[in-house]
Amino acid sequence: MRREAAAISPITGIVSAIRAGEIVILVDDEQRENEGDLVFAADFVTPEKINFLAKHGRGLICMPVTEAHAQRLGLRPMVEQNRSRHGTNFTTSIEAAEGISTGISAQDRALTIKVAAAPDAKPEDIVQPGHVFPLVAQPGGVLVRAGHTEACCDLARLAGLSPAAVLCEIMRDDGGMARLPDLIDFAAQHKLKIGAIADLIEHRSRNESLVQRVSERDIETTWGSFHLVSYRDLALGSIHLALVQGRPSPQAEILVRVHEPLSVVDLLDAGPGTHAWGVGEALEAIGQAGTGVMVLLNCTQTSEALEARLAETRTPRGGRGMDLRLYGIGAQILRDLGVGRMRLMAAPRKMPSMVGFGLEVTGYAELPKR
């Protein structure tokens, strides 16, 4: 463990390396993909770098870009419904419209990335399909989704470069995915720095926020007295609410429920086809425990959103999936409220990493039997 911790460079060092055009290794949390990617800023793409990724990384060479840049290029999702395990946002693959031979060579892929990453790039500059795979980062970066795609764009932006990058997963000689012990040896062999996405989240969380606390007051509910705190989503302008009972502290394990999307339907429909935990059930459990937090996301609902919610067919409890963007929003709210260790009132599921936010999921509360 000491060897692994010592091998991770501080984020300031990783940003400096990206700014200098170096290749770095970026690792995510072991509870997520648990992999390392070779990463460099798209502004510094060369055939030599692409060849290094293909020869030593062995994974799929992709090009993370921001949503704004993807729209500028007219990139469309690879599939209409993204059902991948981690919600990786692939678009249809691309090729430079001119100057390409087969498209797969290091020279051709470097040219495609150079053309597509240009600040003034337009749809006519590329053709589809091709041999380079763009990935679209979520707005808000790693504060919204703790993925390599978002981390790449964040690092390029922090380095003062175009928010586009190149990445490639690192595989072992036997074809398996390289894990941190393998990556440490790989980094030493090729003299590369290793950075952790969790550290990038922590770095950005200290300096940036996606939410702003706007008001708070005490309220009386059917389930007891709560402190109501409202937050404004700085990206979308929507309102999120938090109902707090007791005094959360980073060291104490408390009950937490993050509920999305909040609709009048969620307050009225207590049947078995709604969320894993209903609003009333969660507030009742917090009231009995004496300490806990209930976060209600997207409390600003348009008539169109309400119509869509009313039209939804019932799904089994726990069948609703949360928008990946909202994990980061919920995490920032919980951190602002002083939460550290939390037992979730939710159906057990594979979740994005919360490590960079200073949050630990200790387990899942069992829904009381009726």
Regions found by a protein language model. Give the residues of each.
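Catalytic domains of riboflavin
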Residues: M1-R370
